[in-house]
């Protein structure tokens, strides 16, 4: 089975490639991006290439690209959450500052949520944001997540403690909100 590609009306979510490193660096050297999500500003193209190899190359991580361009504008993906003991997916995302306010992230997240619930058979998906990241909170609310709890967490890359708010969305809650398919899976 090949890599999963998700398509929406405006976006193609595809696997990251090492040749995306210069573009990733251009997006992630911005101090408004990484620290808001809990990671450091990228300092070089080589560092971005290593992030692609070690973090973004997972099977459930996608580069967000516009339909008319191969260049990534951000990223969306799933990891195992720390919100609960049993393994459940947690949705994460970011987008470059030049693409803020265009609803690309909610659109990408909706495609990943549909994939989670209809193709992977997940029962619940988590999402979280640091308390001072209001943009992320708005994305989470647009996608229908419900608040669950807030806790203090140590953010290792930034060497600081932050308050993190956790949200969850069950497959039943998601079904109430969605009746049509907004993406296609390519393999």
Predicted regions and their residues:
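Acyl-donor (CoA/ACP) binding surface of acyl/acetyltransferases
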Residues: 1-36, 61-187
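Conserved GNAT-fold acetyl-CoA-binding loop/helix
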Residues: 32-53
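A short helix-loop-beta-strand connector motif used in the catalytic cores of GNAT acetyltransferases and
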Residues: 52-63
